């Protein structure tokens, strides 16, 4: 399953009416054209703000988790995170209308993550985004 998260730019239409000669294939006619309504497939580098002063030393941005969840799952799907840390994946799952199951081994981190997830649940229930 792949739901690309398109970016948008200027629409365009290009035509390449070139002909030429190739040592491998001989004479050729190239009359291909390209057009775009402005949608662009995602590139291979994502730019998202980093988390500073987070709950967990390796905390990821919610926006990054939302991107991957929207790209590789359907709404209503279950998202699993076996190393939940601060609960970012759970927050992102709620923000994108997915269910989640998370595991965290460290009791001190688990307690903080559970509080964060509950705050996010209340925000999402109230029509806002969890953070």
What spans do the regions from the language model cover?
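Core catalytic lobe of class I
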Residues: 1-111
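S-adenosyl-L-methionine
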Residues: 115-131
